[in-house]
Regions:
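C-terminal substrate-binding subdomain of Rossmann-fold SDR/epimerase-dehydratase oxidoreductases
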Residues: 23, 43-177
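Active-site Tyr-X1-5-Lys
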Residues: 1-17, 40-45
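A generic local structural motif
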Residues: 3, 36-37, 116-118
Length: 177
């Protein structure tokens, strides 16, 4: 990239790369207007899960997946800085890209309770219907692939919230995953 050529060309022992992840989910996210924490809050308070765009698809992945890719990239840059310079995407395979509705339905099944309400309002902000990442470079050059499929990702996410809500320490639950 131009940035790397501008600042790192005279230091061949130092490689620069940028990394991007798909839609990261997992335990510990309590932000507002994010699908997982919004679903968990609705389920736990016996309210409907409000979905703004149920048919939108996203490259969902557990937070630990891109972290493993980032660490592999960092180790590769350390071994051979110039060979791994550039942009990298870390995300699920295209067959694991699913809809917002499928995420909510899976969480309801894992919690054994909950209901969905699909909003239809003019106030809903525009969101892209389909998001995908091309992770071929990470797959082919680094040999990185996600370990968990869509179902496993959501199972681990639901388990994290259930265990922490049940009194287990968040740090221990995360390390156990």
């Amino acid at each position: 990239s131009a940035y790397a050529r501008s600042y790192f060309i005279e230091r061949p022992s130092l490689g620069a790369a940028s990394a991007r992840a798909g839609n990261v989910i997992g335990g510990g996210d309590w932000a507002v207007d994010r699908i997982i924490p919004d679903c968990v809050r609705a389920i736990e308070s016996d309210k409907s899960i409000e979905l703004r765009n149920p048919s939108a698809t996203r490259p969902w992945q557990h937070v630990l997946e891109p972290i493993s890719g980032y660490l592999l990239l960092a180790a590769s840059l350390r071994k051979d800085p110039l060979a791994f310079v550039g942009s990298w995407n870390f995300g699920p395979t295209s067959k694991e890209v699913r809809t917002v509705l499928e995420v909510a339905e899976h969480l309801i099944a894992r919690f054994d309770r909950g209901r969905i309400n699909c909003e239809s309002s003019a106030k809903i902000p525009h969101e892209a219907g389909l998001l995908q990442l091309n992770c071929d470079r990470a797959n082919q050059i680094l040999g990185w692939y996600p370990r968990w499929d869509f179902e496993s990702t959501l199972d681990m996410t639901a388990d994290w919230y259930k265990k922490v809500d049940g009194g287990e320490e968040a740090n221990k639950v995360t390390k156990g995953q």
